[in-house]
């Protein structure tokens, strides 16, 4: 399976830097990168999607066409920008913004019906990891049980919560074992990415694991040169 690199800007990128980054990345890449390189700016960092060399996605959207949803953007807004790719289930939205499994399912089902490409994020906390691998498997299985795993536009990103933003990536053995388990659950055509303190130093090794189909990258992608280096490992 072709390897993938995704940049998640979170809420860290200044607006004009984000716009400049997208334009410069477009100049750097080639058409064959379109399905292999994804960028998720924050809402103000999005631009009308005329990019041909990478896929532009949104970090979040409310599961309605439009309406009285103060502070949200909806499918109509994204469609006006010609954006049809969306992150759902990131741990920061699950924990900080209290998005429940039932709401994540509602989001998934709504945007599945719109034929969006969905990057669905899962991952266990440190307490679960310390209970052992059996507990991890049960936790991750529960996170996946309410969504359609045969949806053809699904990508799953495994991000152990204890490794996000901590500069402590999971060990290669942990990634190998966990991805091996998840591959048994997922449709064989569904890409499975790893995220969690990915950086220029460890990206190549992680991509070398057969069951890792790509990377979802946070802070290491915020500098364009770093992201370009990681793309070169694909």
UniProtKB/Swiss-Prot annotation:
Molecular functions per Gene Ontology: triose-phosphate isomerase activity
Q: What is its EC number?
A: 5.3.1.1
Q: What is this organism's lineage?
A: Bacteria, Pseudomonadati, Campylobacterota, Epsilonproteobacteria, Campylobacterales
Q: Does the keyword DNA-binding apply?
A: no
Protein name as annotated: Triosephosphate isomerase
Subcellular localization: Cytoplasm
Q: Which Pfam families match?
A: TIM (PF00121)
Recorded catalytic reaction(s): these are: D-glyceraldehyde 3-phosphate = dihydroxyacetone phosphate
Q: Which PANTHER family match?
A: TRIOSEPHOSPHATE ISOMERASE
Q: Does the keyword Lipoprotein apply?
A: no
The UniProt family comment states: Belongs to the triosephosphate isomerase family.
Question: Which residues of the sequence carry a binding annotation for substrate?
Answer: 8-10, 165, 197
Species of the source: Helicobacter pylori (strain P12)
Q: Tell me which residues this entry annotates as catalytic.
A: 90, 159
GO biological process: one example: glycolytic process
Which superkingdom heads the taxonomic lineage of this protein's source? Bacteria
């Amino acid at each position: 399976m072709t390897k993938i690199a995704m940049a998640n800007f979170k809420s860290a990128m200044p607006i004009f830097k984000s716009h400049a980054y997208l334009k410069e990345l477009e100049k750097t890449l080639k058409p064959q990168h379109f399905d292999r390189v994804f960028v998720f700016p924050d809402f103000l960092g999005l631009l009308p999607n005329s990019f041909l060399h990478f896929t532009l996605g949104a970090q979040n959207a409310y599961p309605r066409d439009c309406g009285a949803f103060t502070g949200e953007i909806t499918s109509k807004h994204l469609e006006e920008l010609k954006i049809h790719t969306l992150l759902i289930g990131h741990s920061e939205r699950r924990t900080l913004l209290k998005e429940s499994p039932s709401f994540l399912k509602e989001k998934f089902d709504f945007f599945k019906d719109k034929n969006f490409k969905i990057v669905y994020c899962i991952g266990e906390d440190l307490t679960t990891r310390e209970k052992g691998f059996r507990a991890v498997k049960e936790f991750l299985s529960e996170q996946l049980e309410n969504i359609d795993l045969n949806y053809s536009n699904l990508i799953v990103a495994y991000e152990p919560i204890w490794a996000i933003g901590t500069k402590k990536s999971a060990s290669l053995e942990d990634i190998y074992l966990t991805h091996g388990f998840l591959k048994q659950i997922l449709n064989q055509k569904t890409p499975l990415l790893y995220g969690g303190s990915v950086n220029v130093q460890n990206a190549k090794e992680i991509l070398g694991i057969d069951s890792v189909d790509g990377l979802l990258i946070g802070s290491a992608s915020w500098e364009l040169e770093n992201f370009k280096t990681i793309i070169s490992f694909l």
